[in-house]
């Protein structure tokens, strides 16, 4: 009947609203509120006191006793409530069809119950309220000593606000009686339609038990119970308030290795502002192995989170420093409308015991700007963060300050992380900036373990700031941008790892590389603007990759780089560097692959500094090298090009399997110390130059088919003396190499191979005094004057050509191993071989002979060729020689006259 009447009333009010549509807005609002009140007032208030129960009754539904109001202002006697709670689950309900009140539930007296049942399931104390719920006194709902039996779960569903002014305790009970499995604590779950307020004297406890039983393996601490608060309004934890779900302590016994209890998770989720001035803790219990801290999650979906109390999910302590401390639990703070952290956030490991891993800290901030007024939405971390990883979420600005002690990574997934104080991020923390995020240095310096990601680094405050990256010695890649902002940003790469930077940086401060690590740049502006330059300390390296062209950035180099890879190294690609480079003694520069072109007018400058070049790629030095008395050594397998007139007086050395190309007459510096080429090393000349007075020590046949000393392009002159320190090769791949020294080749017993291609030649203008064999492999050996080759040097024709150029020459034994040729010049001259050596049934062609062809026995009239001093060649050997008549044209067989002449 009552419900029918209510329906009639509501329908009447709706019709009335329609008739009064022309009324003012205040009248309409009043009508709406009246309608809403009539629809929601189907509740009665219930108060828990010491007075006898009235206006309410008990009923049993399944295994749950339900107290329901039968009239408004119902009263529930606390003793009645306790008796029911002691044996079964209980629910208090305010809903009543005929009720005219909002349905509040108020606890004016304390409730204390010890579960007196061996039920294996937790009892549930449910409060279903249409209005607010007030805990004005304490409530203790705990399990008895029965083994492994859970206690009470408190479930509150309130249509209005919840206020906690006493102690709500559902913690585990003592294990003094020695049960091997621990009684579990209860849990607390609240869904609040209004605000949640925990007064200064208010506490919610769901702690695990402290185990006091010392003989059995059940001596470990109890786990903490869960606490969950879902609030449609705001949350206010006042100074002195406590939420505690910590794990219990294990018994300190030597008989068993006990474990501290794991902390229970605590979750606070509000829609409006969350003001935290109390204590929220879920610390792991102590034991020979500390317990893990519980997870703490605090959020506001539409407003701020302002924390200024105690927040700890620290792991438990170990009883003994030789055992493992507990891991910290994760902590998450999320304020859609802003986040302020005024006190420490502790997700660290236990203070005693072997170090393990702290919990992760997630900070989600919605501040549009960072303020400094100390308001609830200032976006600042004023306390210290202790734990493992810290993650910045949310699109807002979050300021971090203080000497934070978390040990894991720092991740900015969204928004801006603002550095309030110098070194606020732990030095070993790996920093990762997601796309479109910002690290704002705030006018102070910061050191991080590493930097990865693609966000931006800047400073919104004036002054010089230093960003130091690399102390965790890892390898990371960063594609974001580093800029000055309003300050001047300096960047320092420390540690032994590799930091790859590929963004378009614009910062104007100095770049430093130290600590044995590598700064690898894949952008032409990877080092910022060119104004302040870059310094590479001994043991560290600067790398280039990706086809970049660095501007006129001054560069200072020391040492040979990390693991001898070079203080400056081309990693890959065709790259260029236009800055002047200052070097200390012993600096190494390598081109690992690809090519590196150094294009400054003055490339290398050092005070009596020697340099090392290496790698398998190409290093092109286009400007002047000024090293004082320093030397240059190329020991790589690639090529080094010296293209300018250089200023140094030390030895130039080519070893390994590499090539040193000289493109300027003065590229090898002064001629006081000379050049040394050994092994498979190569010295190349290009461009039609004349290298004056430079001595060359040569051993080996080079790394190709044209010798260890070779002409590459143009007609080039070497006026110094070549000394053979081993059997060696020289040649010309194109053009002519003229040896004009006095002597051209110094005396030795080693042999010389001559290489070349068709149309190229090596010219002996000066004397060749070596007595070892002269082997003509390919190309042409030209005589530049009479008697250039030592008489004792035998000649092996192995595919090459000997051109007299009209000069007389006397040499040792003639051997024939491959089809070869002799070219005679014009004018009267002779080429004399002392005797005949090995003939390998190959053809030796003599070009340019002048005489009567077709008349056997007719001596030559200009150039003549002799083998021995009598007719020593057999018919078989003579048949391996031919005269080529270019005017015939025809090829003629060879005869030998009695004086040894071949005709």
Describe each PLM feature range:
Residues 25-36:
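Bacterial N-terminal signal peptides
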Residues 43-207, 229, 235-239, 352-354, ...:
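Extracellular beta-helix/beta-solenoid repeat scaffolds
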Residues 9-10, 14-16, 38-83, 326-401, ...:
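Extracellular/surface-exposed low-complexity segments
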Residues 114-121, 138-152, 167-187, 201-226, ...:
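Glycine-centered low-complexity coil/loop motifs and glycine-rich tracts
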Residues 1-23:
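N-terminal secretory signal peptides that target proteins for export/translocation
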Residues 93-94, 127, 392, 402, ...:
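Beta-strand-rich, repetitive solenoid scaffolds
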Residues 92, 127, 156, 188-190, ...:
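Residue-level detector of buried hydrophobic side-chain packing
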Residues 135, 164-171, 237, 281-283, ...:
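Surface-exposed loop/turn positions within long extracellular repeat scaffolds
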